[in-house]
Amino acid sequence: MSVSFLIFLPVLGLPWGVLSQVQLQQSGPGLVKPSQTLSLTCAISGDSVSSNSAAWNWIRQSPSRGLEWLGRTYYRSKWYNDYAVSVKSRITINPDTSKNQFSLQLNSVTPEDTAVYYCAR
């Protein structure tokens, strides 16, 4: 028997701040099977992924766990990553300067990973 569960991904650009006009556009699959890898991308407009003043985050929200910060990547003369302890062994967040975007990879997903996933600055 094959079991699947949904990964909800809002399709919208989120402006952050009245003056900044920064928009983030998420993309990725809506359905991932248990034990597979979830891969999501967040394209940035109005700012640079390698900005020295920004951090680029992935968060998720589910009825059972509420709002949960997963991790971030940021540039301060070199690249840094911070990850939530709950997913640290399964998560990778990578910047892509050539496409001005950053990505989330979550390995070995389970039904408990079912959530709405957001990227945020």
From Swiss-Prot:
Gene Ontology process terms (BP): immunoglobulin mediated immune response
Subcellular location: Secreted; Cell membrane
Highest taxon, organism lineage: Eukaryota
Region (Complementarity-determining-2), start-end ranges: 73-81
Cellular component GO terms held in the UniProt record: extracellular region; immunoglobulin complex; plasma membrane
Region called Complementarity-determining-3, residue ranges: 120-121
Keywords, alphabetical: Adaptive immunity, Cell membrane, Disulfide bond, Immunity, Immunoglobulin, Immunoglobulin domain, Membrane, Secreted, Signal
Segments for region (Complementarity-determining-1): 46-55
Signal peptide residue numbers: 1-20
Pfam families for the chain: V-set (PF07686)
Keyword Amino-acid biosynthesis: no
Domain Ig-like: 21-121
Disulfide-bonded cysteines: C42-C119
One GO molecular-function entry: antigen binding
Chain intervals for the UniProt region annotation (Framework-3): 82-119
Main location: secreted
Renumbered residue ranges of the record's region Framework-1: 21-45
The protein's assembly and partners: Immunoglobulins are composed of two identical heavy chains and two identical light chains; disulfide-linked.
Function: V region of the variable domain of immunoglobulin heavy chains that participates in the antigen recognition. Immunoglobulins, also known as antibodies, are membrane-bound or secreted glycoproteins produced by B lymphocytes. In the recognition phase of humoral immunity, the membrane-bound immunoglobulins serve as receptors which, upon binding of a specific antigen, trigger the clonal expansion and differentiation of B lymphocytes into immunoglobulins-secreting plasma cells.
Descriptive protein name: Immunoglobulin heavy variable 6-1
Organism: Homo sapiens (Human)
